[in-house]
Regions:
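Alpha-helical transmembrane segments and their helix-start/interface "positive-inside/aromatic belt" motifs
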Residues: 33-46, 168-180, 380-385, 479-487
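Transmembrane helix-loop-helix hairpins at membrane boundaries of multipass inner-membrane proteins
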Residues: 1-7, 21-122, 198-211, 540, ...
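Membrane-interface helix-loop-helix modules in multi-pass inner-membrane proteins
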Residues: 66-95, 140-143, 147-155, 232, ...
Length: 570
């Protein structure tokens, strides 16, 4: 085992060590000690990020479909469960997103958490480790454990350090997540049992569960896919199982809101597991899911128009963009699948950045009501600039990552089903999705015009009373806040102007998943066609030409044989 193979488990272990160490340090009454805990947590979060830079230099981008930097250590060998880690191009870029944003979220929290600071930073680091574990896991059971353990720190961060309605938000979040977890675990265990029955070993290895899922009949695939779908759709979230997210984002402290909006675990689970494992069911459910995606896009955009709470505005914007993400995934074109991953990256970056900007505004104005904030560019020009920058990124301004991700996703959906592209959607889904994105851009422009460039508001609500007062001194960005926002802005700009490294590295990994899905669908169609042809031939050879000849004379014999495959392809 070479040293390079240890980089992924080290990324996972270092935040956990930091969490254990910080948890044992009592914050005390001194503000300096609390600040020191935040800085220490930031350092433990920064180390894996620096290791991520090393990983970027060692990754073979031409072989993006190959799991690289593999680490494998037996855990439960009798069940073929291992500590198996690795990254391909898809998981690499989502891992980089996590490694960039989480340290910034922790740094943003320094001096802002007023009680039980050691516990807060410990939970943030545990959440960080869980997200890293999700994206580097090559064993499906290991993925599931990290996927579900990520709920625990989010629950405590929301329930302890959230706002006035935090307990309701935490309970609702937990109930939704727990319901999805049960279905998800049952589906994965069933696939492992199928692999034991058909291939002789009980295994949670990724390749083995792919093989087990694809060996199921279309009906069996549909039942298992439904369990995976509900589990992952709750975490996306997708309409109509989205209602936990706006409340959770609104009631969480800013770092907790960032972690909720950042992670794209549900979308990643659908892309990595549900669709390639159960391709026949995925194709069968595609029209239904695509309609839900379009509803998510339009619903999120329309609800955002009437929002006055800054955090709720961002939450419904995230819902709209994730609807586009899953729609592009369902298109099953190379362009659409690439757009799906790009939307995960852009939504994570932009939503996290906007939430941090909104948190900085809240700390100065003590309100989240957008109608009570205006003229930000005059009083806080630097913060106003970053607010405009990230708002415009979300509105898909050309040159920023939001634009390239939305365009690629919409084009991939539009050409889906046309000659030479494959897929099962088309303009009927792409056009309303595009209208939803335009709607989103319009409400972002509206709030930029009002909040940033509107008339200067001199009175703001007091944090503790119902009266209003003119804030004595409203300072622009501090050095720490510059350090939080600048890396995110540079990433949004760089990926918008030069997305080629991401796009090129994704092609092999995306192509591999797409090939597995379409090959399984084609194989099923071919086998069903052969069965139907055999049945027609058997009827003819049995001396009953009257049942066949009229069909052949009308040119319909082939259509009867191909009826199921044609319906499936559509």
């Amino acid at each position: 085992m070479t040293q390079s193979h240890l980089i992924l488990p080290m990324m996972l272990v270092i935040p956990l060590i930091g969490a254990a160490l910080i948890f044992m340090i009592k914050p005390g009454a001194s503000g300096h000690r609390a600040r020191g805990l935040g800085v220490l947590a930031f350092c433990f979060a920064l180390i894996p990020a620096l290791m991520g830079v090393v990983l970027l230099t060692r990754f073979n981008y031409a072989a993006g479909s190959v799991w690289q930097q593999r680490f494998n250590y037996p855990w439960l060998p009798q069940f073929h469960v291992n500590f198996s880690f690795g990254v391909d191009a898809i998981s690499l870029w989502l891992l980089m997103l996590t490694l960039l944003v989480t340290p910034m979220a922790i740094l943003d929290a320094v001096n802002k958490i007023q009680h039980r600071q050691n516990e807060f930073y410990a939970w943030m680091l545990i959440s960080y480790a869980c997200m890293i574990g999700v994206f580097i896991s090559h064993d499906v059971l290991l993925f599931y454990l990290f996927f579900e353990f990520s709920l625990i720190p989010t629950f405590f961060i929301l329930g302890i350090w959230g706002h006035s309605d935090r307990r309701k938000a935490a309970v609702k979040f937990f109930l939704y997540a727990f319901a999805g977890s049960v279905l998800l675990l049952a589906s994965l265990i069933y696939l492992a049992l199928v692999h034991q029955e058909k291939f002789g070993t009980f295994s949670f290895a990724l390749a083995d569960l792919y093989r087990a899922g694809q060996a199921l009949s279309p009906t069996q695939q549909g039942i298992v896919f439904l369990g995976l779908l509900i589990g992952f759709a709750i975490k996306v979230p997708l309409f109509p199982v989205h209602t936990w997210m706006p409340l959770a984002i609104t009631e969480s402290p800013t770092p907790g809101s960032v972690m909720i909006a950042l992670v794209k675990l549900g979308a990643y689970g659908l892309l990595r597991f549900a669709i390639p494992m159960l391709p026949l069911a995925a194709v069968r459910f595609t029209p239904f899911l695509a309609v839900l995606c379009v509803i998510s896009i339009l619903y999120g955009g329309l609800i955002s128009w009437v929002q006055r709470d800054m955090k709720k505005l961002i939450a419904y914007s995230v819902l709209s963009h994730l609807g586009l993400c899953i729609l592009a995934l369902l298109a099953l074109t190379m362009t659409g699948l690439t757009g799906c991953v790009l939307v995960m990256l852009s939504s994570g970056l932009l939503a996290a950045a906007m939430l941090m900007v909104m948190g900085m505004i809240y700390r100065r104005y003590h309100t989240r009501n957008l109608l009570e904030i205006s003229g930000l560019a005059r009083r806080l020009p630097v913060l106003g600039f970053f607010a405009v920058f990230f708002f415009m990124g979300t509105a898909a301004l050309p040159g920023l990552i939001g634009f390239i991700s939305e365009i690629i996703s919409l084009v991939g959906t539009y050409v889906s089903g046309s000659a030479g592209h494959g897929g099962y959607l088309g303009p009927a889904y792409a056009i309303p999705a595009a209208l939803g994105m335009i709607l989103g851009a319009l409400y972002m422009l509206y709030w930029v015009a009002h909040v940033i460039f509107g008339p200067l508001v001199e009175t703001v609500p007091d944090a503790d009373t119902s009266s209003t007062h003119a804030p004595a001194v409203v300072q622009d960005l501090s050095v720490r806040e510059w350090l939080v926002l600048l890396p995110l802005a540079l990433a949004v700009l760089f990926l918008g102007l030069y997305p080629a490294p991401v796009l090129n590295s994704l092609q092999p990994a995306i192509g591999k998943i797409r090939h597995e899905v379409l090959a399984a669908v084609q194989e099923n169609a071919t086998s069903r066609m052969a069965v139907n042809t055999h049945r027609v031939g058997a009827v003819h050879s049995a001396g009953k030409p009257g049942l066949v000849a009229p069909l052949e004379s009308q040119g319909l014999g082939k259509a009867v044989a191909l009826r199921l495959p044609v319906r499936l392809a559509r």
